[in-house]
């Protein structure tokens, strides 16, 4: 498959004739391009192993697509939706997600890499993201409520005011993450590590902990 630029050059015609022109965008590539208002679900079901570097996506929809192992490093997503999208082992390193309509909740993203990305205030509620990497991310006021984040790595992330209520955080790593004002009410924190993490104002009501849960020595919760 060639570049998605070739496929999307005349998006209106492509969507209008989607039954005849339904395409497989696996292994497609784009570099430094802008995509606006595209509902990729009307074009394809597959974007596995695709590679989009330094791209801008505005008001695009990726609902239910198979995007496993795809790379979107150094890209920007404005008001984009990933409802039920399969993002296992995908990479969004150093990328930005913003806008009131941006949505990653209910996405399936095992071991997805968001290292150095900006996900501030993004809705990731009910996402399935065990083993995913949020290392040094901006997660200010991000919504992770009800998500499966077992074994996820939040090292050095700025997660002030983030919502982890009811989340599965067993074995998660919060080393040096800024968690001031974060809400862990009802979260499963068995085996989670909070070493050297600021926790001022964080809420842990009804959170589940065990002997393997590691909290900074100054916090007696």
Q: Residue ranges of each PLM-predicted region?
A:
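Tandem repeat scaffolds
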Residues: 3-221
């Amino acid at each position: 498959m060639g570049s998605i630029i070739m496929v999307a050059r005349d998006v209106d015609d492509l969507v209008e004739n989607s039954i005849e022109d339904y395409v497989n965008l696996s292994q497609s590539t784009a570099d430094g391009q802008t995509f606006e208002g595209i509902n990729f679900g009307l074009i394809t079901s597959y974007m596995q192993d695709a590679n989009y570097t330094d791209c801008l996506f505005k008001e695009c929809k990726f609902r239910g697509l198979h995007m496993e192992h795809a790379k979107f490093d150094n890209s920007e997503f404005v008001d984009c939706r990933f409802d039920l999208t399969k993002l296992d082992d995908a990479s969004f390193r150093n990328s930005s997600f913003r806008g009131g309509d941006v949505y990653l909740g209910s996405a399936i993203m095992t071991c997805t890499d968001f290292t150095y990305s900006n996900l501030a205030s993004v809705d990731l509620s009910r996402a399935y993201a065990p083993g995913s990497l949020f290392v040094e991310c901006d997660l200010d006021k991000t919504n992770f409520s009800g998500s499966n984040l077992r074994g996820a790595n939040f090292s050095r992330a700025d997660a002030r005011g983030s919502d982890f209520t009811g989340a599965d955080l067993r074995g998660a790593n919060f080393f040096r993450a800024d968690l001031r004002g974060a809400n862990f009410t009802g979260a499963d924190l068995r085996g989670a590590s909070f070493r050297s993490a600021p926790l001022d104002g964080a809420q842990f009501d009804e959170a589940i902990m065990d002997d393997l849960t590691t909290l900074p020595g100054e916090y007696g919760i």
